[in-house]
Amino acid sequence: MRTYHCFWLLFWAGQPHQSFLTLLSKRTSGFPEKEKVLVLSGNSRRDLSRSKRSWMWNQFFLLEEYTGTDYQYVGKLHSDQDKGDGSLKYILSGDGAGDLFIINENTGDIQATKRLDREEKPVYILRAQAINRRTGRPVEPESEFIIKIHDINDNEPMFTKDVYNASIPEMSDVGTFVVQVTATDADDPTYGNSAKVVYSILQGQPYFSVESETGIIKTALLNMDRENREQYQVVIQAKDMGGQMGGLSGTTTVNITLTDVNDNPPRFPQSTYQFRAPESTPPDSPIGRIKANDADVDENAEIEYSITEGDGYDMFGITTDKDTQEGIITVKKALDFENKNLYILKVEATNTHVDPRFLYLGPFKDSATIRIQVEDVDEPPVFSRPAYIIEVKEDVPINSVIGTVTAQDPDAAKNPVKYSVDRHTDMDRVFNINSGNGSIFTSKTLDRETLLWHNITVIAAEINNPKQSSRVPVFIKVLDVNDNAPEFAMFYETFVCENAKAEQLIQTLSAVDKDDSYSGHQFSFSIAPEAASSSNFTLQDNRDNTAGIFTRKIRYNRHEMSTYLLPVVISDNDYPIQSSTETVTIRVCACDHRGKMLSCNAEALIHPTGLSTGALIAILLCIIILLVTVVLFAALRRQRKKEPLIISKEDIRDNIVSYNDEGGGEEDTQAFDIGTLRNPEAIDDNKLRRDIVPETLFMPRRTATARDNTDVRDFINQRLKENDTDPAAPPYDSLATYAYEGNGSVAESLSSLESVTTDGDQDYDYLSDWGPRFKKLADMYGSMDSDKDS
């Protein structure tokens, strides 16, 4: 418990005959007794001076956190004018007056009503005054005094963070800085050791230590390995009172993580790996994966794989999967089981990031042996060449062998192979192949001038397994032979003037040859022997593949000979020599003195257009036939006369229209016959439905001839009654009223002709008197009457 003692504070009046106020206060034991005298004049202060009717006091000290049941006594105000008769009244104002601090207005005793906390407010400034109770006037000037709250150790140290997080590299040296923790104490640092904090470690030894005054945490153990332990939890205590017994304390937690360094080399879990790869594996295809283990993480665990040696150094490669840190073994070149079926490689795994500080731990790499077994697969035949080029002369006979392709089964079984030509590449079937030995031969004649290159594809397939096949292109070049005679470069037709002179050039000739000539074409020109002696012209070979035609005589007469045909023989210089005879047409024309053509005969005028005589005759015949056809067609059209629509103004025509009237249903196959109505005697039997077999057959009876004056309605009612009594069919037919067009015609309706009278007393001869318009009707009914009579 806390004990309290008294100390005296005196306030003196500085002049005689003046009253003075004495302020008394208690003091706590343990503090030396002190006495201060302050002289205040009015509201101002001056140390060790006197002033009329002034307050004299010292500052008060009050302990915080008072726990007693009574009010805590602070001090006492007293004036020398107070005679104890209750005439004076003491008033207190300022910080906490009336709330935290109260004063007995009669005695001047000051008390604290609540627990005070220095950490909330360390100093209170109050004002005191004594007044006359009766008049209310102050008997002393108002002055201030101070109450200071004395601190006690009632606050424990508080860390700035509840939890600290820190990290350091593994394998750090002893004394490596980790983190600094800080704790604060709310007590008065200037009073005693209440706010003096000392740090200590409660948990985390022997790995870490803390400096007692600064709170700096350092490593205390050498070579802490993250792979053994990564997380550490350290508890730090902060205690006030300089760490002495009885001081208050607080704790915090520090989570320390060891970060990784590259202190572990990669290691293969096994020294030898076995893989199998079919020989059909395409290049750049993976065949397996290997992985070296590294206890480090992140970039310190990154590994680069490489093939260092082995007989498959050029056949295989290895790459690193950056996500899984695995080595992917791939095929670089095509494998061949028959050539080599086992490869042995040495693979090395190396860290890409190496810390020089830990090189003493050994080389940061490891190696392993890889055995790759190549598996045999059924492969297609392989040709001896990737492509074949064959040259053949165009005059080679049919069925001649021009070349051979060869393919073999690369497998150990050496299956036999058959050959064929892909007909999509040889649609004309110019070539064929021996399926057994691959000999290619011609099946048709070749012509270099038609097609120089033939590109075909030959297929080689295993006989036992035709699906195993391969293809090879065969390029066949047709070589030229001299099988084409030279010919004129164009059609030559020229003219000669009647007044031409001898040895005059009238035309220059040139020739072409479809064949190739390795030494160049050399053509020779001459007049055919049979025409050389009688020719009116001469031919001069220019020795440059051209020739000139010259006149042999002076003057030509077109009336005697209008056209000359000059046969020219053209020969080449290749072997065998080819020659041809071409004809030059020469027209005789009239010319002026300068040699310009004025006129020729009709044929000569036509021919320059480029058309032959036969072509002109064919064109003329076509024109004549076309003209004759047009004339005949026009004549026939004019002879055809169209019947007039109306003969006269009184010509009135009625059209007989045929109507298909429904009413009997779809199964009623017996159509309504208007002819029967006109000729009642034609009704000679009873018509039954064709699609229904009647249950009771009855003999058809002959319908009686209609009586005189029987109209169409009576006849229809009779037929309707017969159909209604048919026991084998429902009543499909019903009475229908038929309307006939033609009302208003002078001849009235056709039905009236039949219904007015019977056949017995009706005479249709009067129809002939109605004119040509009723001739057809009169013929119809007139012939009917004649039939009756017969």
Swiss-Prot record:
Q: Where is this region: Disordered?
A: 261-289
In the UniProt record, the signal sequence range is 1-30
Keywords from the UniProt entry: Calcium, Cell adhesion, Cell membrane, Cleavage on pair of basic residues, Glycoprotein, Membrane, Metal-binding, Repeat, Signal, Transmembrane, Transmembrane helix
Q: Which residues form the propeptide?
A: 31-53
Query: What's in the GO CC field?
Result: adherens junction; catenin complex; glutamatergic synapse; nucleoplasm
Give the matching Pfam families: CADH_Y-type_LIR, Cadherin
- CDD domains recorded: Cadherin_repeat
Parts forming coiled coils = none
The segments annotated as topological domain Extracellular are 54-615
What is the protein's species of origin? Answer: Gallus gallus
Name the chain's protein.
Cadherin-6
Query: What's this protein's function?
Result: Cadherins are calcium-dependent cell adhesion proteins. They preferentially interact with themselves in a homophilic manner in connecting cells; cadherins may thus contribute to the sorting of heterogeneous cell types.
Instruction: Tell me what topology the record assigns in the membrane.
Output: Single-pass type I membrane protein
Some GO term, biological process aspect, for this entry: which one?
Answer: cell migration
Locate the transmembrane regions by residue number.
616-636
Q: Note what the entry says on domains.
A: Three calcium ions are usually bound at the interface of each cadherin domain and rigidify the connections, imparting a strong curvature to the full-length ectodomain.
Sugar-bearing residue positions = N165, N255, N437, N455, N536
Return the SMART domains for the record. Answer: CA (SM00112)
InterPro entries to which the protein is assigned, alphabetical: Cadherin, Cadherin-like_dom, Cadherin-like_sf, Cadherin_CS, Cadherin_Y-type_LIR, Catenin-bd_sf
Stretches of the chain found on the membrane's Cytoplasmic side: 637-790
Protein's UniProt keywords contain Membrane: yes
